[in-house]
Amino acid sequence: VIVAVVLVGQRRWRAFAAQVIPYAMLGVGVLTFCTLNYTHYGVFALSDFSEGSFAAAMGAMMRVDTDSDKPYLSVPADAREKIYEAVPELKPVAYWLEEDAQMENDFRDPGLDDYRAGSFYWAIRRAAQYEGIYADAQTAANYWQTVADKINAACDAGTLPSRTGKRVATSQPITAA
């Protein structure tokens, strides 16, 4: 912003344009992509992984306190068990994550006997797909928002133990060791 003010003040329009055009092009590209997602799927978002209800659900799941101190686990097994008890909407997905041999073979880390953070996202999405939650984008968005709202409400009420405040993210909370 300071560079732009100086360049405009000195009437160096070409230099100003050289600074602004790349950001404007990026903004137009992102806006175009979001608009295309809205027209095709009914959800105005760049990706459901980085924003919106899926990120809200992942952030809520990672909010639940766990007894596990293993690194790389965003939602360890003990946290998932607590969540399944509090959120009945996740019970059908629980079968796929906890009992289906093929799902475990595809996504679980045998050394940890659990889902690493990166594979958990894809495993829970596949489980949701098997349950018909991804029939269309709006159904999926509504489902994940309901899951996020119920987990956050349970954490706020003290029904589920919470290790952080409300968050919308697919990345694990960063803590100083």
PLM region spans:
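Juxtamembrane membrane-water interface segments immediately following transmembrane helices
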Residues: 27-177
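Membrane-interfacial entry segments at the cytosolic side of transmembrane helices
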Residues: 10-25
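Generic secretory/membrane-interface signal
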Residues: 4, 22-24, 36
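Transmembrane-embedded, aromatic-rich helix segments that form part
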Residues: 1-7, 48
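Hydrophobic residues in alpha-helical segments
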Residues: 8-9, 39
